[in-house]
From Swiss-Prot:
Belongs to the ABC transporter superfamily. Phosphate importer (TC 3.A.1.7) family. It is found in: Cell inner membrane. Keywords: ATP-binding, Cell inner membrane, Cell membrane, Membrane, Nucleotide-binding, Phosphate transport, Translocase, Transport. Gene3D superfamilies: P-loop containing nucleotide triphosphate hydrolases. GO terms for cellular component: plasma membrane. GO terms for biological process: phosphate ion transmembrane transport. It comes from the Bacteria. It comes from Shewanella sp. (strain MR-4). It is an enzyme of class 7 (translocase). This is Phosphate import ATP-binding protein PstB. Its main location: membrane. InterPro entries: AAA+_ATPase, ABC_transporter-like_ATP-bd, ABC_transporter-like_CS, P-loop_NTPase, PstB-like.
Length: 272
């Protein structure tokens, strides 16, 4: 089994199957997804708690990133993608035809595997989303930039070079800048798709510490191939296999006393 420092883990008292509406950030109901004739997700249902870190784990191709991208409708951009089922945010199905997808993506931010800063200054990267919303007041932008860079634990490293090109930052700094850009528009939910897979161990540790801080303000959902990382940063973990949600429970249970044989086999390295 993966070794977990139980003294460092927050005890999760949530009954995930019966999570109250007040404690639920997102509810996924009977979600199926197909790319043409190929089905990638099969009847996935789960509730994701507010202001917690939920990790999706599983072998390559299991559907964890596909599921993550459903939460802010990034799969809309994929040809021949068809989705059945519901994802509820504030009790409303985000796949309802009346939903403003741009507004949804402002409320459900996403950070990808590789840092993707824009070819702009550090400052302009952070305030980009605010400018798109028509905010141009300099004081308001300055305050948002500092707040977001502090929130992404990078302010002290960049405060004296805000107008330098973002490409001059290290990989780890660029990823924190991208997180700052995502939280500048104050989303409720932050999706992280393998956010440290392209980073060195020191930068990875910094991002993991940041994730722990982010959950005080945001609901965080992370996809990771690194089981130790899931054990370190998440409050609950969902194990996926071949497009199905096999087991979903508090992280301590998943990594120490999983209920399903497939979960145990994956955690113990019998396949993956």
């Amino acid at each position: 089994m993966i070794s977990i420092d139980s003294t460092a883990m927050k005890t999760n008292n949530f009954d995930l199957a019966n999570l109250s509406q007040n404690d639920t950030a997102l509810e996924i109901r009977n979600l199926d997804l197909r790319y043409g004739d190929k089905q990638a997700l099969f009847n996935v249902s789960m509730k994701i708690p507010k202001k917690q870190v939920t990790a999706f784990i599983g072998p390559s191709g299991c559907g964890k990133s596909t599921l993550l991208r459903c939460i802010n409708r990034m799969n809309d951009l994929v040809d021949n993608c068809h989705i059945d089922g519901e994802i509820l945010l504030h009790g409303q199905n985000i796949y309802d035809k009346k939903i403003d997808v741009a507004a949804l993506r402002r409320n459900v931010g996403m950070v990808f595997q590789r840092p993707n800063p824009f070819p702009k200054s550090i400052y302009e990267n952070v305030v980009y989303g605010l400018r798109l919303q028509g905010i141009n007041n300099r004081r308001e932008l300055d305050e948002a930039a500092e707040r977001s860079l502090r929130g992404a634990a990078i302010w002290d490293e960049v405060k004296d070079r805000l107008h330098d090109n973002a490409f001059g930052l290290s990989g780890g700094q660029q990823q924190r800048l991208v997180i700052a850009r995502a939280i500048a528009i104050e989303p409720e939910v932050l999706l992280l798709d393998e956010p440290t897979s392209a980073l060195d161990p020191i930068s990875t540790l910094t991002i993991e510490e940041l994730i722990t801080e982010l959950k005080t303000k945001y609901t965080v959902v992370i996809v990771t191939h690194n089981m130790q990382q899931a054990a370190r940063v998440s409050d609950q973990t969902a194990f996926m296999y071949m497009g199905e949600l096999v087991e979903y429970a508090d992280t301590n249970t998943i990594f120490t006393t999983p209920k399903k044989r497939k979960t145990e086999d994956y955690i113990t390295g019998r396949y993956g």
